[in-house]
Amino acid sequence: DVIFHLAGISGFPACASNPHSAQLINVEATRLLRDSLSKNQRLINASTTSMYGKSGKHCDEETAVEPVSTYAHTKYAAEKILHDAENVVSLRFATVFGFSPKMRMDLMVNDFTYKAVKEKVLVLFDSFAKRTFMHVEDAADCYIFTMDHFDEMKGDIYNAGGNHLNYSKEEIANLIKDKIDYNIINSELKDKDLRHFIVNFDKIEKLGFVPKRTIQEGINELIKVYSFYEYFSHYKTI
């Protein structure tokens, strides 16, 4: 059996709104899952690059983590719980973008594009801040890749994404502006989300995984979808 551990409260806003639930679901439920595994079951854990924090530097899997949110803290705690378990791979995913049936609207590329299309204005906080991104279909492909290469990857942690997909907030906003006209306002106020880092994906790329979809392709897809897609925030119900 292969278990894809996707259960959890995901993202800065959702975890900040209910830290107790984030601890119970992201950390304690992971502990229960680990204790329930048989020796023959393989587990692929969905972790996050968010734990690299606000260093502003290039980060690989050996870089000391600096979690700056409840979300990042709980995901790192889950990683540590699984560290000594047999048959486990942890994937530190980039921020996902692109359309899906239950799309998260709080993710940066999805959110920025929605505001450009629907509101015609985007206010940027800490426009210099860098993040790393990955199309949702590439994220799914990464799970399949890891399943197919499990024996080679087990017992380790991998950044999941691509070296060509590190962008600043301002760069994302301008890529959207290349496709649709809207106003970008740079605010002097600080963002509550302090993340700022550049992620290195050499480790997983050397095994053969490289994301195929570009940011530009994702933006084009979202612009088309937002002509009929009704906004829903997944964490309002938490």
Describe the function of each predicted region.
Residues 119-120, 124-238:
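C-terminal substrate-binding subdomain of Rossmann-fold SDR/epimerase-dehydratase oxidoreductases
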Residues 50, 95, 166:
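PG/GG-rich flexible active-site loop of Rossmann-like NAD(P)H-dependent oxidoreductases
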Residues 17-32, 65, 69, 73-74:
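Glycine-rich NAD(P)-binding loop of the Rossmann-fold in SDR/ketoreductase-type enzymes
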Residues 5, 31-70:
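Conserved Rossmann-fold NAD(P)-dependent oxidoreductase catalytic core, especially the SDR/UDP-sugar
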Residues 13-20, 54-58, 101-102:
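Conserved catalytic-core motifs of eukaryotic protein kinase domains, centered on the activation segment
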Residues 7, 44-47, 68, 92-94, ...:
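Active-site beta-alpha turn of Rossmann-fold NAD(P)-dependent dehydrogenases/reductases
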Residues 1-25:
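NAD(P)H-binding glycine-rich loop region in Rossmannoid oxidoreductase-like domains
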Residues 80-131, 136-145, 174-176:
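NAD(P)-dependent short-chain dehydrogenase/reductase
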